[in-house]
């Protein structure tokens, strides 16, 4: 399953160029309404043999941006795609983003 997120920005969003950890925090914070599930995803995930698999992946942020020093500045909107084979994960994120909003930082 996939979730497409479109966020209208009231003001420019300034992030470090390496912002992936911030997106992960946003995702795990949104999923924290189910602490046991969040803990499972973050600390264990699914395994097959000796390999462990995380149950979601996300795209880079898309939108109009400018690079300034070690930051990336997004203007007007950003878009993000999150994919997972777990329907519950996508539904939790969708509900959390719609009703709880998204905050970076």
Can you annotate each of these PLM segments?
Residues 1-105:
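RNA-interacting cores
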């Amino acid at each position: 399953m996939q979730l497409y997120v479109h966020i209208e920005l009231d003001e420019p969003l300034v992030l470090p160029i390496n912002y992936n950890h911030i997106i992960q925090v946003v995702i795990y914070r949104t999923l924290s309404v189910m602490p046991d599930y969040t803990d499972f995803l973050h600390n264990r995930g699914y395994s097959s043999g000796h390999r462990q698999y995380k149950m979601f992946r996300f795209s880079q942020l898309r939108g109009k941006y400018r690079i300034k020093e070690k930051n990336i500045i997004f203007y007007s909107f950003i878009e993000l795609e999150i994919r997972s084979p777990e329907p519950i994960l996508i539904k939790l994120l969708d509900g959390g983003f719609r009703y709880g909003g998204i905050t970076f930082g």
